[in-house]
C-alpha cells in the first residue's frame, strides 16, 4: 500500500527502491511498496573539541574549538553525498563525532607543526582561517559544510606552562611600560604648560597687529566702495539718456515708414482699379472670340466625328476577326498538345505498369528461390542431424533419393550402345609348383611377359585397328 510522506522545513525524504536508479531527495512524495523512505535532518550540529597539537618548536598546547557543522543545503550533489554516507548514522553518534573530530584534529596538528608557538599565538585569526579552509576541504567529500568555527584561547598542557610564562612576561613588560608612560606624561605636561603660556602671549600680540591691519583695510575698502557706487550711478544715468535718444530716433523712423506705406497703398489701390478694368475688358473680348471659335469647331468636328467613328468601327471589326482566327488556331494547337500529352501519359503509364509487373514477377521469383533454398537447407540440415553429421551417408542418400545411380547407368548404357567389344583373357601359363628356384622363377616371369605380348598386340589390333611398332615385332599374316 502506498503512503504519502511530507518532510518538515529542515528535513528531506531520502527514497530508495524500485523505479529509482540511485536515491531520490524529496520534500513530499508517495512511498510505494518496494521502496524505503528515511528522514534526513538538515539542522547543523555543534561539535566541541580540545585538540592537542605541537608547534614547530615541539611545544605542546591545547586548542579548544567549537565547530557548527551540517549538510550543505544549497548544493544537490552535496546533499546526495551526505544522504549516502552520513544519513545512515545518527548525527550525534560516535561514528559522525569521531569522523569530524579526526578530520579537525588531523588538519590542526599538521598546520600547527608548520608554525612556531609565537606565530600561532599572535596569528590566531589567520590560524583559525587556515584550519577552517583545510577542514572544509575534507568535509566536502561527505557533503558537510562548516557554518561557524570558534577557536578559543590557547591553553597550556600540564607540565608545559608556556602561555603562563608568556603572560607573566607580558605583564612585566606592561608594568614597566606603564611607568615609562607616566614619566613621559609628567614631562609632557610640564613642557606643555610652559608652551601654552608662551603661545598665549604670542597669539595676543599677533591678534592686536592683525586687528589694526584689518581696521585700515576696512576703511580703505569703504572708501573704494563709495567711489564705485558713485561711478556706477553716473554710468547708469548716461545709459538711460542714450536709451531715451535711441527710442526717440526709432519713433521718428517708424512715423516716416508709416507715412510712406500709406502713400504707397493709395497709389497701389488706384493701379489695382485700372488693372481690374483692363482684365474685365479682356475677359469680355476673350469670351466673344471663344464663342465664335466654338461655333466653327462644332460645324467642322461634326463631320470629322462621323468619319472617325466609321473608321474606328471598321478597324475594330478587322481586329476582332484576326483575334478570333488567332484564338481558333491557338485552341487547335492547344488541343493537339493536350492529346499528345495524354498519349504520352498513357504510354508512360503502360510502360510503368509493365515494368512494375516484371519487377513484381522477378521479386516473387527471387523470393521463391530464396524460400526453396531455405527449405532445401533445412531439409539437408535435418538429414545431417538425423544421420549423425555423416556427410558421406547424406550424400549417398541424396544420390539414391534423386535417382542419381539410375541416371549414371542410363548414361553409360547410352554411351556403349552399338559397340561390339571383344574380350581377351591371357596368362603366362606358369606357376611355381614345379620346385623351381627363385632365380629361375624370376627369368620365368620375364619369359611370361614376352609370351603375353603377341596376344596383347593382337587384341589391340582387333579392337582398335592399330599395329605395334616394327621394333617391337609384327603380327603374323594369319592373325591379320
From Swiss-Prot:
Similarity comment: family membership: Belongs to the band 7/mec-2 family. Flotillin subfamily.
Function, as annotated: May act as a scaffolding protein within caveolar membranes, functionally participating in formation of caveolae or caveolae-like vesicles. Required for early symbiotic events and nodules formation.
Record-annotated disulphide pairs: none
Post-translational events: May be palmitoylated.
Factors inducing expression: Up-regulated during nodulation.
GO biological process, one term: nodulation
Membrane-spanning intervals of the chain: none
Annotated localization: Cell membrane; Membrane, Caveola
Protein's recorded name: Flotillin-like protein 2
Coiled-coil regions listed in the entry: 237-257
Membrane topology of the entry: Lipid-anchor
One Gene Ontology cellular component: plasma membrane
Tissue specificity: Expressed in flowers in green pods. Primarily expressed in vascular tissues. Upon induction of nodulation, expansion of expression in the root cortex in the region of elongating root hairs, which will eventually become colonized by bacteria. Expressed in the infection zone in nodules.
Origin superkingdom: Eukaryota
Species: Medicago truncatula
Keywords per UniProt: Cell membrane, Coiled coil, Lipoprotein, Membrane, Nodulation, Palmitate
Lipidation residue positions, type S-palmitoyl cysteine: 37
Pfam families per the UniProt record, alphabetical: Band_7
Gene3D superfamilies hit by this protein: Band 7 domain (3.30.479.30)
